[in-house]
Amino acid sequence: MKYTIIENRHLTGATWLMRLRGDTSGISKPGQFVNVAVDGCFLRRPISICDWDDSTILLAYDVVGEGTEKMSKMLPPQELDILCPLGNGFDISVPSERPVLLGGGIGTAPLYGLAKALMNKGIQPAVVLGFASKERAVLHDLFVDLGLPVYMATVDGSLGTKGFVTDAYKEAGLDADYFYACGPSPMLRALCDVMPVSGQLSLE
């Protein structure tokens, strides 16, 4: 299906933000993703849906290879062939009053749509995000704009707690009764070891 680019801008480091106009009627849950076809590349690129409305989707992506490099050069009103939506997404029907959202790197992206979905149910989640450094921290301002408590961790200590998402969670002293997490495999494994409550995991 064809989607029209209406915005494609650089955020920081290797991260870009792209907004597209097209059919979003199939998107039913936060945490779903799309597969993007890029001219000259055999494989489609899987990218998490950051946010969506009745006619647009918002994607945050890192430039890590030929396909995403080509995406970063595209301008409105170019079109992309996209399979949308894919994946099971997060189940927000799980009873929870004090959930925490835990994101690492570009895995932060789908948690934004998740935060908005929870808020629409009257639930105010806490947000804990981890990055390599202050320069690579992305999208945290979106959660701040929602009025949510946001706790940060960076490996080099340049922003927030020095260390990882798990360190920032412990330092924040949050009393969460459920968690949702998206990020790299090592982060998710660490969370499974330290989180005292059950939750849902999604690979970035």
Per-segment meaning from a language model:
Residues E66-E204:
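FNR/FR-type flavoprotein reductase catalytic core
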Residues K2-Q78:
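Ferredoxin-reductase
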